[in-house]
Regions:
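Conserved N-terminal phosphate-binding loop of PLP-dependent enzymes in the Aspartate aminotransferase
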Residues: 1-199
Length: 199
């Protein structure tokens, strides 16, 4: 980030998966004291209820567009881009309501607390020989399993047999539950995973 700033290079953060509270802060980039010039967000902005995405620009970029427009450059020529998930009243209304609920119910603070709780619980089983590493932030955690066959063909179906829908990306079992997950549900997830791994 420092090198980009020094050389006047715009920084872009892809926060489609990590933004809107998923990592325990509003934007994941906040965890790293990183202030991007452009931010792409989606998914959680509507809590998954409606396909919505947005591209956010800092004031410096907007000011430069305004200056170009004052010099006779039409806005449509300055800012040419497309996005298939923007411009709907329904999406905007849902997103505003989601942001209101996140703030009203302190859900991002809860994600941070639940994420720490989940990480502590998962770290208790990390010594299992089938686990290479557990990493993540907030409620975006990856459990790196010793091999992808075990992750996809054994752990994933077994977890589903216990009522837990999981996704394996290669060797990594993803733990990215609803922000409303309870500590009891986290315990059930970890205990079920541990039992499957120790069979």
């Amino acid at each position: 980030a420092e090198l980009s700033r020094k050389n006047d290079i715009l920084m872009i953060a892809d926060e489609v998966t990590t933004g809107i509270g998923r990592t325990g802060t509003f934007l994941c980039s906040e965890n790293f004291n990183f202030k991007p010039d452009i931010i792409c967000i989606g998914k959680a902005i509507s809590a998954g209820h409606y396909p919505v995405a947005a591209t956010l620009f800092n004031q410096k970029i907007i000011d430069s567009w305004n200056e170009l427009e004052k010099m006779g450059q039409p806005y449509s020529q300055i800012h040419r881009r497309g996005n298939s998930l923007v411009g709907t009243q329904e999406g905007s209304a849902i997103s505003l309501k989601v942001l209101e609920i996140l703030e009203r119910d302190n859900l991002i603070d809860e994600v941070n607390e639940k994420g720490k709780y989940a990480m502590d619980k998962l770290k208790e089983i990390e010594q299992n020989s089938n686990i290479r590493e557990i990493r993540g932030k907030g409620l975006l955690i990856g459990i790196d399993i010793s091999n992808s066959d075990l992750a996809k063909n054994h752990i994933t179906p077994e977890m589903r047999n216990h009522g837990i829908n999981v996704l394996a990306e290669g060797r990594v079992i993803m733990f990215n539950p609803s922000y409303l997950i309870s500590r009891e549900q986290i315990d059930y997830y970890v205990n079920t995973l541990n039992n499957i791994l120790t069979k």
